[in-house]
Amino acid sequence: MQGHRIGYVRVSSFDQNPERQLEQTQVSKVFTDKASGKDTQRPQLEALLSFVREGDTVVVHSMDRLARNLDDLRRLVQKLTQRGVRIEFLKEGLVFTGEDSPMANLMLSVMGAFAEFERALIRERQREGIALAKQRGAYRGRKKALSDEQAATLRQRATAGEPKAQLAREFNISRETLYQYLRTDD
């Protein structure tokens, strides 16, 4: 049964170009998530999983665009292929159908493990770079949401009993950020 070719694209940040991932690839519909790969709650991935039917092919630029770790990758590939949906990874040149040979399953495991390893190396280099920048005094981290004066006012008003949700809205911060300010004294 010949179905539709459906694309899945994931970009980690809003400045990445999602079109680049499936350029020159014919697909009838594309689902695009702007979220981290480690976040398994991706609305467009969930929509794709609900949308695809037996005979369809899901086209993904590379394995690391679908999942950041081997367990999630295997689970998603198995979930799709058990429903009669093919999955095609362009960068790796691999297609999975559910009737895969032991060699294809080995390739899925090896390539998925390499993607996971590569991500771990990137995170390690990022941490090392931040540590070096901190030593040189060049890294200051994220800009604070509130000035010291605003933070002091926030603490006073929260201590006085004003509703925290109202304060968060007024200061234009999330409630989690509000609670972080209330936990710290700086």
Swiss-Prot record:
Origin: domain of life: Bacteria
SUPFAM superfamilies: Homeodomain-like, Resolvase-like
Database matches in CDD domains: HTH_Hin_like (cd00569), SR_ResInv (cd03768)
Ranges of the DNA-binding region feature: 164-183
InterPro entries: Homeodomain-like_sf (IPR009057), Recombinase_CS (IPR006118), Resolv_N (IPR006119), Resolvase-like_N_sf (IPR036162), Resolvase_HTH_dom (IPR006120), SSR_resolvase (IPR050639)
Keywords for the protein's UniProt record, in alphabetical order: DNA integration, DNA recombination, DNA-binding, Plasmid, Transposable element
GO biological process, one term: DNA integration
Single GO MF annotation: DNA strand exchange activity
Pfam families found in the cross-reference section: HTH_7, Resolvase
Ranges for domain Resolvase/invertase-type recombinase catalytic: 4-137
Signal peptide (residue range): none
Membrane-spanning segments: none
Catalytic residue positions: S12
Reported function: Resolvase catalyzes the resolution (a site-specific recombination) of the cointegrated replicon to yield the final transposition products.
Sequence similarity: Belongs to the site-specific recombinase resolvase family.
PANTHER family named in the record: DNA-INVERTASE FROM LAMBDOID PROPHAGE, RESOLVASE HOMOLOG YNEB
Annotated protein name in UniProt: Transposons Tn4653 resolvase
Organism: Pseudomonas putida
